[in-house]
């Protein structure tokens, strides 16, 4: 039976993770109802109800929920909890590629909690919300909205008062900065991978181009589309995909090594088109909106002062940008780290662009994965 490309992507991601864990040959399809039995740790996925959730904008998101994935178990003191935020167009299944008994994120040692982003299609999103707030009527979501929901999950469901660490890649990294600004005093440390505390103007403009490419499809119909705006989604895909590697990375053909490998650039683009084409257009736009508004200073506690918010991150921080990231250049983290009280900047010297922070050989080199793992292990030893 054929799988749609979104499901195939999720299956492929999980297969890669399992192959790494068990050191067996990669297989293209996995029965997700059975693969959890093969994991050497306990895991579960569930919906956490937020009921009518008050947003930073003042609006209320009705019947809100987070889709939460947990790998590992809390110890008796609940001191081994790691919050692992999701990235743009990613999910808890994407994050699972970073787990392993020999990895820094070892679920036999830590309880790794992944709350999916709002607008991801997994937690409350334009595509899964009831009429009056569905599609283009879905409220605008900020990073702090996600952080407030996650804090409610951590404190009320798990009863955790002091999580050991908060980590995230890309949009997950931006969440890590936001979490640190609000909850650094009760958190062991944060690790933002390939992300900034504030979305730069250049990054904002790039994302705006991606948005307009999608919205230019006549079938988009201001978000009230009857069927997916395929041309717009393809235009979005081509725009966004261009940012994943820099000139040298694409010229060297590093993109052809992603996942199971591609014969040529066209097949790579076709794959990316199919993946983004399987994501709801309003969900994509919702995530982009959150990304564009990213700024840890945009909170009443900090009076729109980014430097003040950075100074309020009073827990240890390991900030790890990629040396070839077009979306979040390493140089943009330097002034941010300088404002933080206990932050270390460790650059991933890589050819693999933004995806170097994905922590998987499906996305980057083994050298990058080993380097990141080594530094996370060192950081965990420091804060434990």
Where are these regions (language model features)?
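N-terminal cap/lid subdomain of alpha/beta-hydrolase-fold enzymes
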Residues: 69-131
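C-terminal segment of N-terminal export signals and the immediately downstream linker at the start
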Residues: 23-42
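Short beta-strand/loop motif that positions the catalytic acidic residue
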Residues: 313, 319-321
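N-terminal export signals
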Residues: 7-29
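Conserved acidic catalytic loop of the alpha/beta-hydrolase fold
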Residues: 144-164
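Alpha/beta-hydrolase-fold enzymes
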Residues: 186-188, 192-274
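Catalytic active-site module of serine/aspartate enzymes centered on a nucleophile-bearing elbow/loop
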Residues: 343-384
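Short alpha-helix in the alpha/beta-hydrolase fold that links the catalytic acid
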Residues: 306, 329-338
């Amino acid at each position: 039976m054929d799988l749609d490309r979104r499901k195939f992507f999720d299956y492929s991601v999980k297969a890669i993770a399992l192959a790494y864990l068990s050191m067996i040959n990669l297989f293209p399809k996995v029965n997700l109802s059975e693969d959890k039995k093969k994991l050497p740790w306990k895991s579960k996925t569930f919906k956490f109800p937020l009921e009518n959730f008050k947003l930073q904008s003042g609006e209320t998101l009705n019947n809100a929920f987070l889709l939460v994935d947990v790998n590992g178990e809390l110890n008796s003191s609940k001191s081994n909890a790691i919050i692992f935020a999701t990235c743009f167009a990613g999910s808890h299944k994407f994050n699972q590629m970073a787990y392993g008994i020999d990895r820094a994120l070892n679920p036999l040692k830590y309880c790794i909690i992944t709350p999916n982003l709002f607008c991801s299609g997994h937690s409350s999103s334009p595509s899964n919300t009831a009429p009056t707030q569905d599609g283009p009527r879905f409220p605008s979501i900020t990073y702090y909205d996600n952080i407030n929901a996650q804090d409610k999950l951590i404190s009320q469901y798990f009863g955790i008062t002091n999580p050991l660490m908060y980590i995230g890649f890309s949009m997950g990294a931006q969440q890590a900065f936001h979490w640190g600004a609000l909850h650094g005093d009760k958190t062991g440390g944060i690790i933002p991978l390939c992300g900034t505390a504030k979305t730069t103007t250049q990054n904002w403009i790039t994302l705006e181009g991606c948005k307009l490419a999608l919205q230019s499809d006549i079938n988009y119909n201001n978000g009230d589309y009857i069927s997916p705006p395929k041309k717009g989604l393809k235009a979005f895909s081509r725009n966004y995909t261009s940012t994943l590697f820099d000139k040298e990375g694409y010229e060297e053909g590093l993109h052809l090594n992603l996942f199971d490998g591609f014969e040529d650039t066209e097949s790579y683009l076709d794959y990316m088109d199919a993946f983004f084409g399987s994501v709801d257009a309003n969900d994509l736009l919702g995530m982009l909106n959150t990304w564009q508004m990213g700024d840890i200073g945009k909170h009443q506690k900090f009076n729109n002062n980014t430097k003040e918010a950075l100074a309020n991150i009073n827990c240890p921080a390991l900030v790890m940008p990629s040396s070839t990231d077009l979306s979040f250049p390493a140089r943009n983290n330097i002034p941010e780290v300088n404002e933080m009280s206990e932050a270390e900047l460790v650059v991933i010297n890589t050819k693999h662009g933004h995806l170097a922070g994905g922590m998987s050989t499906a996305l980057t080199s083994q050298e990058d994965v080993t380097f990141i793992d080594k530094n996370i292990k060192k950081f965990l030893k420091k804060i434990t």
